[in-house]
């Protein structure tokens, strides 16, 4: 029972220490939040994302005019292959050559993100760049080159463009609000951890209860601080 009370008193003291230094914690959090805001706004260069989407159906040109269940099922399995084709070395090299980009195929691949929504045959191609017009230009060129490559390799009848890439109006990164919030919370957590750490390392006797807990003896009396009584 005594040990349980000691734990409760210790926890209370830790909370009290945090509350006592709440102004310092708030100031540090505001400084780190402002630093994150300034870094995201003035140092990090914004990037823009343009996305184009294609629809591919595994349909053979033959006597059957419509789509069969087998065609649809095969198309679902092949979309992962399409993603690999889009990011293949041949496709990237052709895009770099056509647009005369000052990039290597590997550098271009780092700007590209290919996603395939679950249970669909739709492929989304997103390109990031610091210039919004350049991002859309690369995305549309990549779509055209990849479409021809997909048709020649997989023998599908057609690759349909669902959506052309357009220049983005607002940047996709950095997320200034999120970064500022992370900076603020990091300041709060970091300062709180330091305060708690210093409090736990402080072995000085500050209260009469500390003597009882340390020596396991009942305190008979306390000498008053005469300076505070004046």
Curated annotation (Swiss-Prot):
Name residues in a coiled coil.
none
Subcellular location per UniProt equals: Cell membrane
Task: Name the UniProt key words of this record, in alphabetical order.
Answer: Capsule biogenesis/degradation, Cell membrane, Exopolysaccharide synthesis, Membrane, Transmembrane, Transmembrane helix
Q: Provide the primary localization.
A: membrane
In the bilayer, the protein is annotated as: Multi-pass membrane protein
**Molecular function GO terms recorded:** carbohydrate:proton symporter activity; protein tyrosine kinase activity
Please, one GO biological process term? capsule polysaccharide biosynthetic process
Domain of life where this protein originates: Bacteria
Which pathway, metabolic or otherwise, does it act in? Capsule biogenesis; capsule polysaccharide biosynthesis
Q: Which GO terms describe its cellular component?
A: plasma membrane
| Membrane-spanning segments | 24-44, 181-201
Pfam families per UniProt: Wzz (PF02706)
PANTHER family attached to this UniProt entry:
FERRIC ENTEROBACTIN TRANSPORT PROTEIN FEPE, TYROSINE-PROTEIN KINASE
Q: What role does this protein play?
A: Required for CpsD phosphorylation. Involved in the regulation of capsular polysaccharide biosynthesis. May be part of a complex that directs the coordinated polymerization and export to the cell surface of the capsular polysaccharide.
Provide the family line: Belongs to the CpsC/CapA family.
Q: What is this protein called?
A: Capsular polysaccharide biosynthesis protein CpsC
């Amino acid at each position: 029972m005594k040990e349980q009370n000691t734990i409760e008193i210790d926890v209370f003291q830790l909370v009290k220490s945090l509350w006592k230094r709440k102004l310092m914690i708030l100031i540090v959090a505001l400084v780190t939040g402002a630093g994150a805001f300034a870094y995201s706004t003035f140092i990090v260069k914004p990037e823009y994302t343009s996305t184009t989407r294609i629809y591919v159906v595994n349909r053979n040109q033959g006597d059957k005019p419509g789509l069969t269940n087998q065609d649809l099922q095969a198309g679902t399995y092949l979309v992962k292959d399409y993603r690999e084709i889009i990011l293949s070395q041949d496709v990237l090299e052709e895009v770099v050559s056509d647009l005369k980009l000052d990039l290597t195929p590997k550098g271009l691949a780092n700007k590209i993100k290919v996603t395939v929504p679950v249970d669909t045959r739709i492929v989304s191609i997103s390109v990031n760049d610091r210039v919004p017009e350049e991002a859309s230009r690369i995305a549309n060129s990549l779509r055209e080159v990849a479409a021809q490559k997909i048709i020649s390799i997989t023998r599908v009848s057609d690759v349909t463009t669902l959506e052309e890439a357009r220049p983005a109006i607002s940047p996709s990164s950095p997320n200034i609000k999120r970064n500022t919030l992370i900076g603020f919370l990091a300041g709060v957590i970091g300062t709180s951890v330091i305060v708690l750490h210093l409090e736990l390392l402080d072995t000085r006797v500050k209260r009469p209860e500390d003597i009882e807990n340390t020596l396991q003896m009942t305190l008979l009396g306390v000498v008053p601080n005469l300076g505070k009584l004046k």
